[in-house]
């Protein structure tokens, strides 16, 4: 058995030796003080006894140690390996390691213990054994984990080979190690507060958004039928003094706890992101406030807004900016915080106005963005006219729409309203019921006047949508009922009425932008995903095939959500400052979550529910679009189908029938915990899959991957390209629609741009808001896109690797299709008047160099990482 590997045996002692390679990254490379540089000095500190490794057998058990796999002798890292090996990513270091390991006695290694005897942590990537008797190919131990000094842990750090095993198939020698590792990650006996090195995944409610001790509380979200919410990761911080149920908050500079391997462990952009958001919150916001206080504080024309991109804004150098320069690594924030002198806030030109500064104002572009904008999942097919409300009549009375056939009849290409309904050509963007219940509270906030809107569209013969009418409704108290006072506006192209119509579209955009940020983006991707991240780490071993399938789609999600709780969605945070629901925003999202349904989050189910597609066995993906040129849906179905095919092929390798799935204890515990704890406020819902069949697991995993990758990409990376020019996507409206005979109406005639701008988002809110979405719309240079993996040896299973290669190839084919459709002049919704091609669901799988960094408005990352 050992004859073929004579070179790994020292002949004299007959003692087998296994040679390995360790790849790690030192902490200070990742500290970014020497940003992007390869740090070679000091590597010697890892040699000698600094880091030790011990192999664990997968085949030979130790009866004196509970029949666990036998543990070999400690081995230390050896010489630093340089140029003879394939090139390394910046900052990676390779070391040799030699193990005394007699395969005849100890069998085949299946796991490894790594101990760090330094004072600093390091990031361990992989340990590879090249020639192991009895094993075809290399043994790769996957880590991708921070290893802290050994005295920080109550247990040994154990890493497993990259083999995939269902619990029932795990080698008996390794089963206790597998169970121990899950117990350590659950940390159910550790209350916290957790420290930086901890690896505990536990749940908590959203009780850390407010600051009760400083008189700024917020409702606790989650744990109550009145305010249900997905769970977040627990930090274990102390409660506030005023409210024992609320968790105390940290200052912005402190790191909020997330399990250590969830924190941005890779290079480049990720830490920059954290610093950028904090720089905006702590430095740029005060500077902008000072600027606005010392100038007229308003834009007067569209050119004033364009100057933000063409010239920049000179901000005063407030003390907070100086402080940040001292505290943050300069390389990271040199763009945001220039070293000295004048602070010029200069923003890149958003794509929506790059080719044509006026196109955003057209009805064609307004309608196109409903199908190919940043929130393209709201439009529904109209099935009755006039549109009805589903609000409770005992509380709201009759909220049936006031839009009549007379408003729209002349723009239906010769059809009657009934004929247009019957031929699937009437559609609605209906924000009326979504916002009406909250408007009395929301309009009580300073600087707000928001309408609840309904917008009707007609599907024209050329495949584009035309807006027919906009209904603006405000709440009106009549006795015990909140009735609606509604006005209907129709398209106009000349005089004051053209500007009235332009304002009507702006009020619609305010609704749509608030829903987009709060629901389509925050709730339906970021918040609902976190329970899946936590449950997967608590209940599925890293060796479980489903853990290997899903874990790339969780990268950085807990970290970005923690950062959001710290600076964006907290009381007084940037979100409350810039989006109209203000302090009611997160509470509103809790009301919406009451009706969240996991099985409706997949794309085909969503399209069918909205009536924009029908089931059709003859169509390629069993779904036929009623709006054929619907870029989000057309590209999305391609992506959905590719994910579904990949997931199905992968699961079939491990689950040969439904019985295997039902007998998988880890998987059943995972699904039960998602349902009963992570999304526990909805645990009684009848729609939850029972997880009795492989088809249910396929659908669930496809949906999880879809939400984390394509759905998030569709709502995130278009933020700055579409909404970076605020007149196109205002986030607030400040006053009511001008009525004939009023001073406001006169102003609209005299100085329409000024009147329009004074109605929408203020200057302060605009500058803060677009500074933020500029950061949030960027791809990092180390982005891992759908169809890519950050570790090529993520599994040893050749069947899984081959299925994944087919998935990647399919995605590259889809890239070609997207480009082809964007070049098809017959598909008018692909580019629109702004000449801005729809690329948000272009996978970018083919980009393996990180070339597409920054604001590209294309590419589907694996995970919600920004």
From Swiss-Prot:
Give the EC class as a word: oxidoreductase
The record's comment on protein family reads: Belongs to the lipoxygenase family.
Entries under CDD domains matching the protein: PLAT_LH2
Annotated ranges, domain PLAT: 33-161
Tell me the GO molecular function terms: linoleate 9S-lipoxygenase activity; metal ion binding; oxidoreductase activity, acting on single donors with incorporation of molecular oxygen, incorporation of two atoms of oxygen
Which organism does this sequence originate in?
Answer: Oryza sativa subsp. japonica (Rice)
Presence of the UniProt keyword Flavoprotein in the record: no
The free-text note explaining how the cofactor binds reads: Binds 1 Fe cation per subunit. Iron is tightly bound.
> Which cofactors, by name?
Fe cation
Which residues lie within the region annotated Disordered?
206-250
User: Per its UniProt record, what InterPro entries does this chain match?
Assistant: LipOase, LipOase_C, LipOase_C_sf, LipOase_CS, LipOase_Fe_BS, LipOase_plant, Lipoxy_PLAT/LH2, Lipoxygenase_dom_3
Q: Which top-level group of life is the source organism from?
A: Eukaryota
Which Pfam family, just one, is annotated for this protein? PLAT
What is the name of the protein in this document? Putative linoleate 9S-lipoxygenase 3
- Give the pathway listed in the UniProt entry for this protein: Lipid metabolism; oxylipin biosynthesis
Write out the coiled-coil annotation as residue ranges. none
EC number, as in UniProt: 1.13.11.58
* Summary of the function given for this chain in its UniProt record: Plant lipoxygenase may be involved in a number of diverse aspects of plant physiology including growth and development, pest resistance, and senescence or responses to wounding. Catalyzes the hydroperoxidation of lipids containing a cis,cis-1,4-pentadiene structure.
Q: Does the keyword Iron apply?
A: yes
User: What's one GO BP annotation on this UniProt entry?
Assistant: fatty acid biosynthetic process
Q: What's its catalytic activity?
A: (9Z,12Z)-octadecadienoate + O2 = (9S)-hydroperoxy-(10E,12Z)-octadecadienoate
Specify the Lipoxygenase domain's residue ranges.
Answer: 164-866
What keywords sit in the KW lines? Dioxygenase, Fatty acid biosynthesis, Fatty acid metabolism, Iron, Lipid biosynthesis, Lipid metabolism, Metal-binding, Oxidoreductase, Oxylipin biosynthesis
**Residues involved in Fe cation binding:** 521, 526, 712, 716, 866
């Amino acid at each position: 058995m050992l004859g073929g590997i004579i070179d790994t045996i020292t002949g004299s002692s007959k003692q087998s030796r296994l040679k390995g390679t360790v790849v790690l990254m030192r902490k200070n490379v990742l500290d970014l003080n020497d940003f992007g540089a390869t740090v070679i000095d000091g590597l010697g500190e890892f040699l000698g006894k600094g880091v030790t490794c011990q192999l664990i057998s997968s085949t030979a058990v130790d009866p004196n140690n509970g029949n666990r796999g036998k543990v070999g002798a400690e081995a230390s890292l050896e010489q630093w390996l340089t140029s003879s090996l394939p090139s390394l990513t910046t900052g990676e270091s390779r070391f040799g390691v030699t193990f005394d390991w007699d395969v005849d006695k100890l069998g085949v290694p299946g796991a490894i213990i790594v101990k760090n005897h330094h004072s600093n942590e390091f990031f361990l990537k992989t340990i590879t054994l090249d020639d192991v008797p009895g094993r075809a190919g290399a043994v790769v131990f996957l880590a991708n984990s921070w290893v802290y000094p050994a005295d920080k842990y109550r247990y040994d750090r154990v890493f497993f080979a990259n083999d995939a095993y269902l619990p029932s198939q795990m080698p008996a020698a390794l089963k206790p190690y597998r169970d121990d590792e899950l117990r350590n990650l659950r940390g159910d006996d550790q209350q916290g507060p957790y420290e930086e090195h901890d690896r505990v995944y536990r749940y908590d409610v959203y009780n850390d958004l407010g600051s009760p001790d400083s008189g700024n509380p917020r409702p606790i979200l989650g744990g109550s039928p009145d305010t249900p919410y997905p769970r977040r990761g627990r930090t274990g911080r102390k409660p506030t003094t005023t409210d024992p149920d609320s968790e105390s908050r940290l200052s912005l500079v402190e790191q909020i706890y997330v399990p250590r391997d969830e924190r941005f462990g890779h290079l480049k952009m990720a830490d920059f992101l954290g610093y950028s958001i904090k720089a905006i919150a702590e430095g740029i916001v005060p500077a902008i406030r000072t600027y606005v206080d010392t100038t007229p504080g308003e834009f007067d024309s569209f050119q004033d807004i364009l100057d933000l991109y063409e010239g920049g804004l000179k901000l005063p150098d407030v003390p907070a900016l100086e402080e940040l320069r001292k505290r943050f690594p300069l390389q990271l924030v040199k763009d945001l915080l220039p070293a000295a002198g004048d602070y010029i806030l200069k923003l890149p030109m958003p794509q929506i106005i790059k080719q044509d500064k006026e196109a955003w104002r057209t009805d064609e572009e307004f309608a196109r963005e409903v199908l190919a904008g940043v929130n393209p999942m709201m439009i529904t097919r109209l099935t009755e006219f006039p549109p009805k409300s589903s609000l409770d009549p005992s509380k709201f009375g009759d909220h049936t729409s006031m839009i009549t056939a007379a408003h729209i009849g002349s723009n239906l290409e010769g059809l009657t309203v009934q004929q247009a309904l019957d031929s699937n050509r009437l559609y609605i963007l209906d924000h009326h019921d979504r916002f009406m219940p909250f408007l009395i509270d929301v309009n009580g906030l300073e600087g707000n006047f928001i309408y609840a809107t309904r917008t009707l569209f007609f599907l024209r013969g050329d495949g584009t949508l035309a807006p027919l009418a906009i209904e603006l409704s405000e709440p009106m108290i009549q006795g015990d009922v909140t009735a609606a006072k509604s006005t209907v506006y129709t398209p106009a192209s000349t005089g004051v009425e053209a500007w009235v119509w332009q304002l009507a579209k702006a009020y619609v955009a305010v609704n749509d932008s608030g829903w987009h940020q709060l629901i389509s983006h925050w709730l339906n991707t970021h918040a609902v995903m976190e329970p899946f991240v936590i449950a997967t780490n608590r209940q599925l071993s890293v060796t479980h095939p489903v853990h290997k399938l899903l874990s790339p789609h969780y990268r950085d999600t807990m970290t970005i959500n923690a950062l959001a709780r710290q600076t964006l969605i907290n009381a007084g945070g940037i979100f409350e400052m810039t989006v109209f629901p203000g302090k009611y925003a997160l509470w509103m999202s809790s009301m919406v979550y009451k009706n969240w349904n996991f099985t409706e989050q997949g794309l085909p189910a969503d399209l069918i529910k909205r009536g924009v597609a029908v089931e059709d066995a003859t169509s390629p993906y069993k779904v036929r679009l009623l709006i054929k040129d619907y870029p989000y849906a057309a590209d999305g179905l391609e992506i959905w189908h590719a994910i579904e095919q990949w997931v199905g092929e992968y699961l079939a390798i491990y689950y040969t029938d439904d019985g295997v799935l039902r007998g998988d204890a880890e998987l059943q515990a995972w699904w039960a915990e998602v349902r009963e704890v992570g999304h526990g406020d909805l645990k009684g819902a009848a729609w939850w899959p029972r997880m009795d069949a492989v088809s249910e697991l396929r659908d669930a995993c496809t949906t999880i991957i879809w939400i984390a990758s394509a759905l998030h990409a569709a709502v995130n990376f278009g933020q700055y390209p579409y909404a970076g020019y605020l007149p196109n996507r205002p986030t607030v409206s400040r006053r009511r629609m001008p009525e004939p005979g009023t001073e406001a109406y006169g102003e609209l005639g005299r100085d329409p741009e000024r009147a329009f701008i004074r109605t929408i988002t203020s200057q302060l809110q605009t500058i803060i808001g677009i500074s933020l979405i500029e950061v949030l719309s960027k791809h990092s240079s180390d982005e891992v896109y759908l169809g890519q993996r950050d570790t090529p040896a993520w599994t040893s299973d050749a069947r899984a690797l081959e299925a994944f290669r087919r998935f990647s190839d399919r995605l590259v084919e889809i890239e070609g299709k997207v480009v082809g459709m964007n070049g098809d002049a017959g598909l008018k919704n692909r580019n629109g008047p702004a000449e801005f091609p729809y690329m948000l669901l272009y996978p970018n799988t083919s980009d393996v160099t990180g070339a597409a960094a920054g604001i590209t408005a294309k590419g589907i990352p694996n995970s919600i990482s920004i």
